[in-house]
Amino acid sequence: MNLANHAYFNLGGHLSEHELLLNAGEYTPVNHRLIPTGEIAPLKGSALDYSDWKALGDTALDHNFVLPEDGKLRRAASLRLRATQLQLDVLTTQPALQVYTGDGLNTPFAPRSGICLEAQGFPNAPNQPNFPNIVLEPGGTYRQRTIYQFKKIATA
C-alpha cells in the first residue's frame, strides 16, 4: 500500500523564489521512463542536495528522496517564501518524500504553479527487493501520519 497526498503548494509567489530544505541524504534514481531502478544514491554535493536551504530556481524536480528514521514522526521537508514570510513544514512517519515541481502541469494551471511534497513509500517497491516492503497482507493494518504545518517566519 502506497498512499500519497498529491496536493500542490505555493506560498504566494513564483515557484522559483521558494526555498526548499529536505531531511534526506539519499534518493532513488530512475530510468528513462521515470521508474526507480532499485538503486539508492547519495545526495551530498549533487544538484539534488537540499540539506541546506536552497532556492528552487528553474530546477525541475520529480524525485523520491529517502528519509532517515523510517516509522518515526520527523520533519521531512520545509518550504519557505521570504517575500510572504510563510513557511510550510512537512512531518511524516513515511520512509520517503516525492518532490514534484509541477513542470508538467497544463490548463487550467501553468507549469510550476505549485510544488508537491508527497510523503510515501518507495515507488516501485514491489519490484525492488532492497526497498522497504509496502505490501499489506490480508488482516494487516496500514498506519502512517503526515502533518502539513504553516507558520509565519521573520524576514532576515
Placement of each model-derived feature along the sequence:
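An exposed, glycine/acidic-rich loop-and-rim segment of catalytic or binding clefts
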Residues: 1-156
